């Protein structure tokens, strides 16, 4: 017997009928205006159900996520987020490049890295080298342009109310990550350290210390999990790029948010709707529960 929970961004009868057909005794529960939970004992294997959900996602243009009973029912006490194009709407290095007038060159390398076509460490060094001589004042300009992803503040607030420890682990840079940490009331921020000239006025085009790549993100999640005395099922990771997949695999629930196709196929779950707050539905937190959590300002 295999028990599972399927969470889908739809309440359309034809979609729910397809999902219900995967269960022996599926129970349906509305989570809100747009999300539905169907849970119970599957007729076939978990892998078959996941494949069916991927087909439903593609043919019905919905987010259909099949989660194991253990994954769905375990409270998430540690959540690690990617930053660029996940918590915020920018890719910070692209914004720095725009200030330097080299956005096309840097964006091309960024795209190759996020699609897993070139090594992230190599791509980061190549991109940062193009920023040599850029004034450090530009960093504050970029921070001033940061816009948060819809639902990011609400998701983080609700998770904090639920007692979770929140971490941003970014392949971007420390000043931006610290700003995001402060704005979203996160507990920890990890990112790459840009090297400055001796007078502190310009970027040298180099990164100091170990690069925060996919492996380092996974290590951060693992280290924090061990510090907190948690098991894998009590953790969650959210990201959009290929370099987030190792971190997602290290977590109990990996969520690909508006991610590249390869990432969506390999992650535990996916969200393609514009708001990050939708991640709460994958935890079984319905609309009314979310409203109560958001009303609590403590």
Swiss-Prot record:
Binding, substrate: 91, 127, 170-171, 217, 243
UniProt entry tagged with the keyword Kinase: no
Keywords per UniProt: Amino-acid biosynthesis, Hydrolase, Magnesium, Metal-binding, Serine biosynthesis
Pfam families tied to this protein: Hydrolase (PF00702)
Active site residues of this protein: 82, 84
Superkingdom of this protein's organism: Eukaryota
Reactions listed under catalytic activity: O-phospho-L-serine + H2O = L-serine + phosphate; O-phospho-D-serine + H2O = D-serine + phosphate
Cofactor(s) listed: Mg(2+)
Positions that bind Mg(2+): 82, 84, 240
Family in the record: Belongs to the HAD-like hydrolase superfamily. SerB family.
Official protein name in the record: Probable phosphoserine phosphatase
Species per Swiss-Prot/TrEMBL record: Schizosaccharomyces pombe (strain 972 / ATCC 24843)
Taxon lineage: Eukaryota, Fungi, Dikarya, Ascomycota, Taphrinomycotina
């Amino acid at each position: 017997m295999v028990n599972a929970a399927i969470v889908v961004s739809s309440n359309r009868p034809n979609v729910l009928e397809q999902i219900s057909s995967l269960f022996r005794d599926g129970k349906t529960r509305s989570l809100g205006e747009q999300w539905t939970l169907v849970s119970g004992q599957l007729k076939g294997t978990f892998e078959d159900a996941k494949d069916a959900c991927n087909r439903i996602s593609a043919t019905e243009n919905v987010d259909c996520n099949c989660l194991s009973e253990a994954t769905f029912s375990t409270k998430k006490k540690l959540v690690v987020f990617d930053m660029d194009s996940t918590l915020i709407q920018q890719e910070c290095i692209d914004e720095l490049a725009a200030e330097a007038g080299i956005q096309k060159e840097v964006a091309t390398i960024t795209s190759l890295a996020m699609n897993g076509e070139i090594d992230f460490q190599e791509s980061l060094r190549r991109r940062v080298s193009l920023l040599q001589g850029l004034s450090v004042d530009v960093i504050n300009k970029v921070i001033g342009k940061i816009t948060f992803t819809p639902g990011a503040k609400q998701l983080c607030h609700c998770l904090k109310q639920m007692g979770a420890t929140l971490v941003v682990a970014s392949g971007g840079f420390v000043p931006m990550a610290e700003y995001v940490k402060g704005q979203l009331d996160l507990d920890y921020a990890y990112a790459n350290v840009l090297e400055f000239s001796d007078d502190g006025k310009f970027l040298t085009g180099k990164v100091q210390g170990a690069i925060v790549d996919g492996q380092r993100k996974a290590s951060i999640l693992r280290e924090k999990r061990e510090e907190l005395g948690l098991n894998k099922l009590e953790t969650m990771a959210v990201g959009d790029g290929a370099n987030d997949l190792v971190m997602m695999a290290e977590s109990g629930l990996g969520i690909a948010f508006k991610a590249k196709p390869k990432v969506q196929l390999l992650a535990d779950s996916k969200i393609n709707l514009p708001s990050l707050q939708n991640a709460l539905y994958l935890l079984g937190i319905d609309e009314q529960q979310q409203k109560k959590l958001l009303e609590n300002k403590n």
